[in-house]
Amino acid sequence: LIVDDSVVARSVLSRMVEGTRRFHVVAALGEARSALEYLRTNRVDIILLDIAMPGIDGLTALPDVVLAGQGAKVLIVSSSADEGAATTLQALALGAADTLVKPGVGAFGGRFAEVLEERLSKLFEPTGDGGCSARAQPPSPAAVRPRSPLAMLEPFQIVAIGASTGGIHALSQLLREIPASFQQAILVTQHLPPSFMHYFATQLAVLGGRPCEVATDRLRIRPGRIIIAPGEAHLRVVRTSEGAAIRLSTEWAKSGCMPSVDPMFESVAEVYASRAVGVVLSGMGRDGCEGAGRLIEAGAPVLAQDQATSVVWGMPGAVANAGRATAVLPPDEIGRLIGRGAAR
């Protein structure tokens, strides 16, 4: 589905998509409102969405488009989608899967068609269990009652957080509630294109009020720091003679995601056992569900974001429905709970 107010852009993008011979344009619409109406009765795999449009602009419509898409990936194609631009980061925070700078009218030549096909192909890569596929379905709501918060968190040394669509905003809310005195390490696996990871790290450092860096192989895990998985590798934790460290790997994960939350959770469970806390925030699919099970088996609590505050209650919903959530809470409450637990 193409959503762009420019007739020329819709025409050119349609030709390029059809020219891939792998993807087919089912509709090309000129405004976000029409797109929402179309998605009420039609299913698509990928949505190309412009930002600057009359009426409802793309950013304003994005959360509703993500929900109406029922698992469709949203690719922002806009002239204001420069990497690192505030608009781009906001789009990713609101649920876009990726962004692509749209050239000006009359400048659609060069490699743009090739880059567009590459982005579409990446968004539609097949996966093992639908975890990161374009048609992953959110689970049905589960009746999960949180246990008493203060009775839940025993002393811990590390927090591992997994998130995808809508997870950046949730992570921001969570980090704002963690006090500056918090000295436990925080690991984050967020589904984002590799090119955005350094901007993301800078953003988290400001929000979290503590150093944040993109993981490199054999990086030591130190107190009071945030480490995020790079976009092109899984983040795993290993024991070393000098303490815990990061190892990066690129093997296939069952979820099909790169990076995947499962390897992070599984390795954290192995190294830290009950001295860890797992968190699953808003995201499409089931990534993190298998790893959450390993954390629970090791005696570590797993906190899942609630459905009401999730852009997509896929990942946290899968954990809750599988009985692997110690508590289901809004992200700000998760942050306060973690902060209180560390202070005990």
Report each predicted region and the residues it spans.
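Conserved acid/base catalytic micro-environments in cytosolic active-site loops
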Residues: 1-2, 6-22, 28, 33-36, ...
